[in-house]
Amino acid sequence: MKIMRKTHPLAKMVNHAFIDLPMPMNISGWWNFGSLIGMCLIIQIATGLFLAMHYTADTLTAFSSVTHICRDVNYGWLIRNMHANGASLFFICLYLHIGRGIYYGSYLYKETWNIGILLLFTVMATAFMGYVLPWGQMSFWGATVIANLLPAIPYIGPDLVEWIWGGFSVDKATLTRFFAFHFILPFIVAALALVHLLFLHETGSNNPLGIPSNCDKIPSHPYYTFKELLGVIMLLGLYLSIVLFFPDLLGDPDNYTPANPLNTPPHIKPEWYFLFAYAILRSIPNKLGGVIALVLSILVLALFPFLHTSNQGSLTFRPISQFIFWILVSDLFILTWIGGQPVEPPFILIGQIASILYFFIILILFPVAGLIEDKILKW
């Protein structure tokens, strides 16, 4: 087996990528989330494939086909709950993975980081379109609200929104194309994930100290495979607990009502993992400004490598930057809370302050803190 692992063309690729891959000795549990995201993607593709066998992408039958899956298909309720909650788990792992990248300076590997941002956009698009498919009230009105942002784009906006709609409003054509895109995008995500890994293996993994570790590496298997197995077991425990005991904990009750274009829900909001971006969108009174802020809330991550002013890669020995990082995390929690609240005082003002603080921390405070810390250390 050892000889085949190192000689067979396909086995050799797997060997170099996962088995004999040199890894830094000192990486912590925060480095587990890459493999956990991969596991979430596999679960989502597998459960999604089984759901697609019974789902019908038609406005008249979409809602009843989801009901049919839950009531009549063998273990359909389980597959549907796994798929719906798997998305939440996916985003929890994604956000923790990005947070680790910011904290430990992994953004300095520019190619890997930029592919990661592209992956985030693709996963967000996939999740948004998936939320539309059950054709409940929040599915329909969520699609309507987000699609109505597109006309704000100068010149091409009105044509773009009609092209996405496939008509003059969110209707059958919209649902059909959203289903087609939702089906194909996870495979594009899987391909991009391989490119992400390819770039990562060009430079090697980062480590908590943020310094080169070429002289002190160990093979990925068996050391890190067993370490990651612990993360997998813990995550599966949390996942199955939610799926089997609290399947509707992270969903919206409005989505159990069939879509009705004549009845607007009192409060339209996306899934919890988009609420921070939704809060930033709502905090700007101008439509185009809101759309720009929404895109920049994610795209600002691409500026991290250029805003890095410190001579140290990681935040491990940078207390001022650590403090600012945790303020940023707190700010994101506040934005998530505000995104789920109605548009009325005092939530409007809190959302605007939190949105300004979000960009201020990333664009101003982080670079300034890096310079101050270097000055204190006389570097």
UniProtKB/Swiss-Prot annotation:
Residues engaged in binding heme b b562: H83, H182
Keyword Oxidoreductase set for record: no
Cellular compartments per GO CC: mitochondrial inner membrane; respiratory chain complex III
GO biological process, one term: mitochondrial electron transport, ubiquinol to cytochrome c
Alphabetized Pfam families for the sequence: Cytochrom_B_C, Cytochrome_B
Domain of life: Eukaryota
Annotated positions binding a ubiquinone: H201
GO molecular function: metal ion binding; ubiquinol-cytochrome-c reductase activity
Keywords: Electron transport, Heme, Iron, Membrane, Metal-binding, Mitochondrion, Mitochondrion inner membrane, Respiratory chain, Transmembrane, Transmembrane helix, Transport, Ubiquinone
Membrane topology: Multi-pass membrane protein
TM segment ranges: 33-53, 77-98, 113-133, 178-198, 226-246, 288-308, 320-340, 347-367
Family matches, as PROSITE patterns: CYTB_CTER (PS51003), CYTB_NTER (PS51002)
Cofactor(s) needed for function: heme b
Cofactor binding remark: Binds 2 heme b groups non-covalently.
Subcellular location: Mitochondrion inner membrane
Binding site for heme b b566: H97, H196
Family: Belongs to the cytochrome b family.
Additional note from the record: Heme 1 (or BL or b562) is low-potential and absorbs at about 562 nm, and heme 2 (or BH or b566) is high-potential and absorbs at about 566 nm.
PANTHER family linked to this entry: CYTOCHROME B
Subunit and partners: The cytochrome bc1 complex contains 11 subunits: 3 respiratory subunits (MT-CYB, CYC1 and UQCRFS1), 2 core proteins (UQCRC1 and UQCRC2) and 6 low-molecular weight proteins (UQCRH/QCR6, UQCRB/QCR7, UQCRQ/QCR8, UQCR10/QCR9, UQCR11/QCR10 and a cleavage product of UQCRFS1). This cytochrome bc1 complex then forms a dimer.
Function: Component of the ubiquinol-cytochrome c reductase complex (complex III or cytochrome b-c1 complex) that is part of the mitochondrial respiratory chain. The b-c1 complex mediates electron transfer from ubiquinol to cytochrome c. Contributes to the generation of a proton gradient across the mitochondrial membrane that is then used for ATP synthesis.
The protein, known as: Cytochrome b
Gene: MT-CYB
